[in-house]
Structures are given as structure tokens and as C-alpha cells.
Amino acid sequence: METPAQLLFLLLLWLPDTTGEIVLTQSPGTLSLSPGERATLSCRASQSVSSSYLAWYQQKPGQAPRLLIYGASSRATGIPDRFSGSGSGTDFTLTISRLEPEDFAVYYCQQYGSSP
């Protein structure tokens, strides 16, 4: 029987803005899933951010973060189509449709650039 592996993702970043800090909170903190299952990761901003400036990253131990999604829903070059991003305003989601063994990692969302 296969033991579920852990999929982790965390709060990443706050950026100063003219109206104060934008705080991004991710949930849940840990997912226990097996290869082939679907993963849904949520990122909530403390105030509305432009979808144009929301990114998702994957990081594995000892490696630099890898850009997965930019502009909330656009896949970076070379990213498999099992990764998809969606959302707007304050609520954003990263979905991995069918987990592969190499997908077990830490995931971050980031607000970058400007916000309206």
C-alpha cells in the first residue's frame, strides 16, 4: 500500500504598497496526497491585487524556486499542463490535476510589481 507523501506550501511574501502591506496567506499548510490525485492550493490576499501580478513557484530542497505560473493563470515556459492557475481580486488557486512523484515540493504564491 502506497503511503501518501506530503505536499507543502507556505505563506510567502508581503510587499509594501501605498496603502500599506499586502499580505498573502496560503492554505492549507500541508496536504497529504498520493501520485495521481488532484491538489488544490489557495492563496488569499489581504487586499485586492491585479491578476497580472500574481505568480506561483515550486521549490525543492537545495534548489532555487521555479516559476510555474505568472499573471495568475499563464504557465511559464516548460511547465506541464497539469499545472493551472486561476482567480482574481483577493482569491487565487493553483491546481495540479494529477500529481506526479516530482510534484511533491513546497509551493509559494507571490504578488509582484504593482497593484491597482
From Swiss-Prot:
Region annotation Complementarity-determining-2: where it falls in the sequence: 71-77
GO cellular component: blood microparticle; extracellular exosome; extracellular region; extracellular space; immunoglobulin complex; monomeric IgA immunoglobulin complex; pentameric IgM immunoglobulin complex; plasma membrane
Region (Framework-2): 56-70
Disulfides per UniProt: C43-C109
Region of interest (Framework-1), residue spans: 21-43
Ranges for region Complementarity-determining-3: 110-116
Signal peptide limits: 1-20
Function comment: V region of the variable domain of immunoglobulin light chains that participates in the antigen recognition. Immunoglobulins, also known as antibodies, are membrane-bound or secreted glycoproteins produced by B lymphocytes. In the recognition phase of humoral immunity, the membrane-bound immunoglobulins serve as receptors which, upon binding of a specific antigen, trigger the clonal expansion and differentiation of B lymphocytes into immunoglobulins-secreting plasma cells.
Protein name: Immunoglobulin kappa variable 3-20
Source species of the chain: Homo sapiens (Human)
Lineage: Eukaryota, Metazoa, Chordata, Craniata, Vertebrata
